[in-house]
């Protein structure tokens, strides 16, 4: 039973990864964030999600200065603004199928209207440094976490790194 449930979670995460790749393929300057959100949510529904677990929002999408804002789902509405040639976009996906959640967030950088593939190629230093720090934290987490570790142990271990 546990293996079957784990497989369902892996499938939802695979859906999220595919949806994020789709988002990277379709994002372009001039695209309205509301339209972008709708396209991402439709992709999730067309490819296996039956609903969205976080207040029925399947894709939280922010760009520019909005990426530094934290918004509760009951107050979220995608901005009626367009993506710029040089922009930072955050996407947080929350699909579900039969009560099994997917949860996946990424940042996309556009430079001269094109998605930047490598962090080292980002010209905007603040964005580059933020993504480098995120990468460092992720790699550190992967290096120190194991199946038997409690959240308390993880918290203690992370605090020793600062």
Features from the language model and the residues they span:
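Active-site neighborhoods and metal-handling regions in enzymes and metal-associated proteins
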Residues: 1-162
